[in-house]
Amino acid sequence: MLVLLLCSVFVGTVHAQDLPEVLIIGDSISIGYTPAVAAELEGKAVVRHNPGNAQDSGTGLKKLDRWIGTEQWDVIHFNWGLWDLCYRHPQSKVQGNRDKVNGTLTTSVEQYEQNLDEIVSRLKKTNAKLIWAHTTTVPEGEAGRKVGDDTIYNEAAERVMIKHGIAVNDLNQVSDSFAAGLFVAPGNVHFTAEGSKKLAAAVSNAISNALQE
């Protein structure tokens, strides 16, 4: 019995090692959909998320090498934006010190574009297939983010991706179609479990297509 158990564990480990390796980099939105992506791609790929929250693109530049590590990634699906376009004020009582009236913008769109250009240049060195995910929707009433800034920052990101020939997964378009009930609350950028599953479907599809290329 013990021998059989050990054999089954060993075979399972070898099988997992033979699967393509996928890295998802992003903020809490991607943390929300990664488990469903991993479940959808079970048996087809090993899906991992960078440790913790990737926050803004400046943080991404600082921590990217650590997140990539020495792993030979087959696909890297990555996103920044919601933290970059957020306004914060140290005296704000709202979670995350968000305050789009009196706060300071985390990353200008010009700096964001420059940061992404540097990030993509580094990611290309991995030889992984790269997929950029457009930033999801900023809803009306968000305390630290302005409606429409998601479009502006996504346009900047798209310029970078076109320059480098990187595939774009338009999660902004996906989330724009969501009913109010798929957001955790009015004025909140986060999604319910059902909303995250819908995003996961788009992410899984993009990764599957990349693996088949």
Language-model segment annotations:
Residues D18, G43-K44, T59-E213:
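Alpha-helical cap/lid subdomain in secreted, periplasmic
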Residues G12-A16:
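Sec/Tat signal peptide C-region and signal peptidase I cleavage site
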Residues P20-T34, W83-L85:
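Catalytic nucleophile-elbow at a beta strand-turn-alpha helix junction centered on a G-D-S/GDSL motif
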Residues M1-V11:
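Bacterial N-terminal signal peptides
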Residues H49-D56:
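Short beta->alpha junction loops
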Residues G32, G58-T59:
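Residues that form or flank phosphate/diphosphate-binding pockets in enzymes
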Residues A36-A45:
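A short, Lys/Arg-enriched amphipathic alpha-helix followed by its capping loop at the start of a domain
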